[in-house]
């Protein structure tokens, strides 16, 4: 029986400062939540081994700073991503409005092979708070307009839907990784034009 190689899935979490990106990651990986807010500087990541459809994979979850001055770090952190998680705060409408720019920024920086079908997942966080400002239907409509992105409403504090959301993230990331592997195993043939063939023929001539 041949053993499958270990799979590393790179997941990027994006969104404005204070929406709960770090808290969601810590709740999922460490089952912990802290009320003390500490802004992420640059980027940080945690890893977690999970089973996805009977396959053991390692998720490398990158938590990036939401401040604009750190967006220039993007290329190094975004490249090679298998899934991108967009997070907004349901009590802060402005964090929802910026999802478009975060999505566009990721696609520019990461340059995925198939941007139209690259897997995103959207999390509407902080549903444990009472002063909700962004309606579920509004968020669902936005996700539907962007190639039907999966949408979850979460609470990092109360651990609501966090596990379920990351299961979907892992499954979609694994699907993306598998498609990239297949693409790399069967690259498109290189087509030579007449000049290239003539040049190759001349170089191989022994006379």
Curated annotation (Swiss-Prot):
Organs and tissues of expression: Widely expressed; high expression found in skeletal muscle.
N-acetylthreonine modification, residue list = 2
Q: Where is the lipid attached (S-geranylgeranyl cysteine)?
A: 205, 207
Q: Which CDD domains has this protein been placed in? A: Rab7 (cd01862)
Reaction it catalyzes: GTP + H2O = GDP + phosphate + H(+)
Q: What does its activity-regulation comment describe?
A: Regulated by guanine nucleotide exchange factors (GEFs) which promote the exchange of bound GDP for free GTP. Regulated by GTPase activating proteins (GAPs) which increase the GTP hydrolysis activity. Inhibited by GDP dissociation inhibitors (GDIs).
* EC numbers on record: 3.6.5.2
Name its co-factor(s): Mg(2+)
How changing residue 162 to M affects the protein? In CMT2B; increases GTP hydrolysis; decreases affinity for GTP and GDP; does not affect interaction with NTRK1; results in higher levels of NTRK1 and MAPK1/MAPK3 phosphorylation after NGF stimulation consistent with enhanced MAPK signaling; increases interaction with PRPH
Post-translational note = Deubiquitination at Lys-191 and Lys-194 by USP32. Phosphorylated at Ser-72 by LRRK1; phosphorylation is dependent on protein kinase C (PKC) activation of LRRK1.
Sequence motif Switch 1, location on chain? 28-41
Q: Which InterPro entries match?
A: P-loop_NTPase, Small_GTP-bd, Small_GTPase
- Subunit and interaction comment: The GTP-bound form interacts with RAC1. Interacts with NTRK1/TRKA. Interacts with C9orf72. Interacts with CHM, the substrate-binding subunit of the Rab geranylgeranyltransferase complex. Interacts with RILP. Interacts with PSMA7. Interacts with RNF115. Interacts with FYCO1. Interacts with the PIK3C3/VPS34-PIK3R4 complex. The GTP-bound form interacts with OSBPL1A. Interacts with CLN3. Does not interact with HPS4 and the BLOC-3 complex (heterodimer of HPS1 and HPS4). Interacts with CLN5. Interacts with PLEKHM1 (via N- and C-terminus). Interacts with PRPH; the interaction is direct.
Query: Domain note for this entry?
Result: Switch I, switch II and the interswitch regions are characteristic of Rab GTPases and mediate the interactions with Rab downstream effectors. The switch regions undergo conformational changes upon nucleotide binding which drive interaction with specific sets of effector proteins, with most effectors only binding to GTP-bound Rab.
Associated clinical condition: Charcot-Marie-Tooth disease, axonal, type 2B: A dominant axonal form of Charcot-Marie-Tooth disease, a disorder of the peripheral nervous system, characterized by progressive weakness and atrophy, initially of the peroneal muscles and later of the distal muscles of the arms. Charcot-Marie-Tooth disease is classified in two main groups on the basis of electrophysiologic properties and histopathology: primary peripheral demyelinating neuropathies (designated CMT1 when they are dominantly inherited) and primary peripheral axonal neuropathies (CMT2).
This one is known as Ras-related protein Rab-7a
